[in-house]
Swiss-Prot record:
The active site is at D23. Keywords: Cytoplasm, Endonuclease, Hydrolase, Magnesium, Nuclease, Ribosome biogenesis, RNA-binding, rRNA processing, rRNA-binding. HAMAP family: RNase_Mini_III. PANTHER family: MINI-RIBONUCLEASE 3. Changing D23N: Catalytic mutant, no alteration in rRNA binding. The lineage of its organism: Bacteria, Bacillati, Bacillota, Bacilli, Bacillales. This is Mini-ribonuclease 3. One of its GO terms (cellular component) is cytoplasm. SUPFAM superfamilies: RNase III domain-like (SSF69065). It holds the Pfam family Ribonuclease_3. Its EC number is 3.1.26.-. Disruption phenotype: Cells accumulate precursors and mature forms of 23S rRNA with alternative 5' and 3' ends. Defects are more marked during exponential growth. Belongs to the MrnC RNase family. GO terms for molecular function: ribonuclease III activity; RNA nuclease activity; rRNA binding.
Length: 143
């Protein structure tokens, strides 16, 4: 497995820096999930991953999990930092508000990764992938 040195003062990184690494982390998790599910054709992989990692999907995942009171107080603070970060660029393919919420989601992923909160990161990603692929939370699947 890849091992990374701890980044000094990762708690102090701005929301966009957290989102930068969070975007990459989420992409790896989603791609791994799709390969594990047996998808191997590049076009299928691209289409399916795009449905989960798009700004719109990430914003929907965030809203869903917030409505479930999924996040801790500390995580909500990170989400707020990510949401309020100003990138200075115009988002492609989505509106500014959706982009800010997806940035918040990615910032939290980046924060959990950099703080080495691996269990919580895995839990969040599992919920996100489940919602992104079916629109339902994992524990609701049984009902």
């Amino acid at each position: 497995m890849l091992e990374f040195d701890t980044i000094k003062d990762s708690k102090q990184l701005n929301g966009l820096a957290l989102a930068y690494i969070g975007d990459a982390i989420f992409e790896v998790y989603v791609r791994h999930h799709l390969l594990k599910q047996g998808f191997t054709k590049p076009n299928d992989l691209h289409k399916k991953s795009s449905r989960i990692v798009s700004a719109k999907s990430q914003a929907e995942i965030l809203f869903f999990l917030q409505n479930q009171s999924f996040f801790t107080e500390e995580e909500e603070a990170v989400l707020k930092r990510g949401r309020n970060a100003k990138s200075g660029t115009t988002p492609k393919n989505t509106d500014v508000q959706t982009y800010r919420y997806s940035t918040a989601f990615e910032a939290l992923l980046g924060y959990l990764f950099l703080e080495k909160k691996e269990e919580r990161l895995s839990q969040l990603v599992a919920e996100a992938i489940q919602f992104g692929t079916s629109g339902r939370k994992t524990n609701e699947s049984a009902t």
